[in-house]
From Swiss-Prot:
This is Sodium/sulfate cotransporter 2. The lineage of its organism: Eukaryota, Viridiplantae, Chlorophyta, core chlorophytes, Chlorophyceae. The gene is SLT2. Disruption phenotype: No effect on sulfate uptake, due to the redundancy with SLT1 and SULTR2. Slt1 and slt2, as well as slt1 and sultr2 double mutants show a 50% decline in uptake while the slt1, slt2 and sultr2 triple mutant exhibits no increase in sulfate uptake capacity when deprived of sulfur. Modified regulation of the SLT3 gene that becomes up-regulated by sulfur deprivation instead of down-regulated as in wild-type. Residues 857-883 are annotated as: Disordered. PROSITE patterns: RCK_C. It comes from Chlamydomonas reinhardtii. Its main location: membrane. Keywords: Cell membrane, Membrane, Repeat, Stress response, Sulfate transport, Symport, Transmembrane, Transmembrane helix, Transport.
Amino acid sequence: MGFGWQGSVSIAFTALAFVVMAADWVGPDVTFTVLLAFLTAFDGQIVTVAKAAAGYGNTGLLTVIFLYWVAEGITQTGGLELIMNFVLGRSRSVHWALARSMFPVMCLSAFLNNTPCVTFMIPILISWGRRCGVPIKKLLIPLSYASVLGGTCTSIGTSTNLVIVGLQDARYTKAKQLDQAKFQIFDIAPYGVPYALWGFVFILLTQAFLLPGNSSRYAKDLLIAVRVLPSSSVAKKKLKDSGLLQQSGFSVSGIYRDGKYLSKPDPNWVLEPNDILYAAGEFDVVEFVGEEFGLGLVNADAETSAERPFTTGEESVFTPTGGAPYQKLVQATIAPTSDLIGRTVREVSWQGRFGLIPVAIQRGNGREDGRLNDVVLAAGDVLILDTTPFYDEEREDSKNNFAGKVRAVKDGAAKEFVVGVKVKKSSEVVNKTVSAAGLRGIPGLFVLSVDRADGSSVEASDYLYKIQPDDTIWIATDIGAVGFLAKFPGLELVQQEQVDKTGTSILYRHLVQAAVSHKGPIVGKTVRDVRFRTLYNAAVVAVHREGARVPLKVQDIVLQGGDVLLISCHTNWADEHRHDKSFVLLQPVPDSSPPKRSRMVIGVLLATGMVLTQIVGGLKSREYIHLWPAAVLTSALMLLTGCMNADQARKAIYWDVYLTIAAAFGVSAALEGTGVAASFANGIISIGKNLHSDGAALIAIYIATAMLSELLTNNAAGAIMYPIAAIAGDALKISPKETSVAIMLGASAGFINPFSYQCNLMVYAAGNYSVREFAIIGAPFQIWLMIVAGFILCYMKEWHQVWIVSWICTAGIVLLPALYFLLPTKVQLRIDAFFDRVAQTLNPKLIIERRNSIRRQASRTGSDGTGSSDSPRALGVPKVITA
């Protein structure tokens, strides 16, 4: 290689940095910053301080930072949520749900940074998916992919594109060749649009057997015992009137009362407190229904008390009865070498050895009759277990007896607040059921009841009631769902009048959690007696009390030590009351600022105006104003008009992204200055010359960048690859724009690893995906787009034809389901059989799960239409043993 010790040092330590980041030992921002500092420590022989620091002032990078402000300003007004809720409409199939959700996101992310797009779209899609009956896991990975694909359509669509534009401007300004290298907003569109369309097509064609969401991540088709609590909304009701039989993915297969088990419960059976229902379904579905209807989970310890009278004391909803509320539920698999094999559940000292209590067991090939305590354990059994305070996943006993990692299924320590929201007359939820309004199925949010304007009350189990103006909906919510509820259009807090009387501007209003001190002056008094608003200039919205659900009316709650108050207040309130004796802990709630809907039109118009300056400049081939100052001025106007406040603007910037990109610029300068970039570029040049094709060289650039983006962040991959690609492109006399397009497309192609792209990471957490689920869809998607990119890069001069073919094929694929229903039934069955074979080949478990789902649905809608055929055998579930 043609470089000296400087190049060797650069390669060695850059490679070491790649290993550190790939192993996720240290974040890329810290890794690149330290690497850059090291490379400057050789008295300028590798890279000078001036060149190393140049990246921190790069115009492309500064543009990225200030576009975060613009996106935050629009998000704070709630404008994007209103637009997207209107565009999404309703859909009952996964195909149309993906078409409706992905295409608008692709269009939006072409002009807004994709990270903010994904941030505000996650709760919208979760609510919409539940409302339409579409699995959330089917929607969130495509959301991330759509935001990335849309970003490849314009030069401002992703931060990576802006970084490459900035690097290109800097490089060719010095070479006095900026005219042929300068990027306008739509210069990437001839190549990015077909790239995005074919990615969209792939998701539509493969969603049935590559996307997760056909089943829960945790144990499937469990038969779980749940107890009707005295406070349950289904107590004293007939089974058919309880609302339980209408729950999707949930069925009642049996009822246990007074020592007798009824395997085929009559729909007219009246449910009594302490009845044990055997509920078949996935755990997360059973858990959701349990929370909604007031059902307590029965574990192995509680099973032994099933023949004795139950206590009627206060019990927490859907926590294992017979003991203290659980900390969390976990899932574990019996290892082949476990000493538990051959022993019954009763014979194992679960609490003493593991700090765990069995709740349910899954075993394949049907269900074995018998009680949980009498089941003989076998290798491969999947257990759902309740944790005790003595549980420690690092115990050697756990490692020896459970295969793989013990995974959390449910965290029971989350605080629950009861929040009342009033329905506005103009609300879109009016004349809709709670489910149709999108208020059911949201993680951490459960509707308790509805108080009508005439003073009457409607229970949550009434699934036919349609919401009316001035209704008050009482909702149990954890802190994670509070932000979603605060921004739900058409609803306002019951305490809104008290909030408004504080005089705090909506621009500076947010929520704070405040834990009441046990010796504080407000203990033993009601919120009304304390005169909380007058004394603290803040309003109590809701109260959480450990182990109990407090009364609904906040003003009448007698405060106790340890209560956690949810307070609406000024953004400075927590700092001002940090040493107040009434509270022991004050913690702001993230993303809880109410939307400034009165500024919605202003925010959208300002952002549109900014984009139009770039579009007009591109059409006129003249830059009237650079995007960086345009973004700064737009943000300033948003601040002045009250779309957001200064604190929100500061917090909107992802400083780790800034540090990563800036340091990566310096590292790329070091690789170029030491000759390392030229040496790697020679390899690409050789490919192009040997194959006599510029397209081959561009494909090599794309693949190298795409692979690098799976290991690093997309921005860092683009910055590292740019000098290598630019040198190769200049040597082969390829247009600088074409070379940069290959890098832009490749750097955005981080689809396999959820940690390679910030958008992937966000949906990974929100959708509760596994790394394997990401890889199953991401790997073939990556290969598909490599093939697509290869065609696009080889036929860049004929982009018009590529466009036409891409649009025609996309339209055909989108409309394909409509054509399917026009075919004869025999042809439809043959098509179904073909895709079943394909799905079974790619994912053998999928067919079994799908058939079981069909059987469960059929059993719920038996000959009498009431679900009377529900029984463990009729469900077609795997061998599952529970209480």
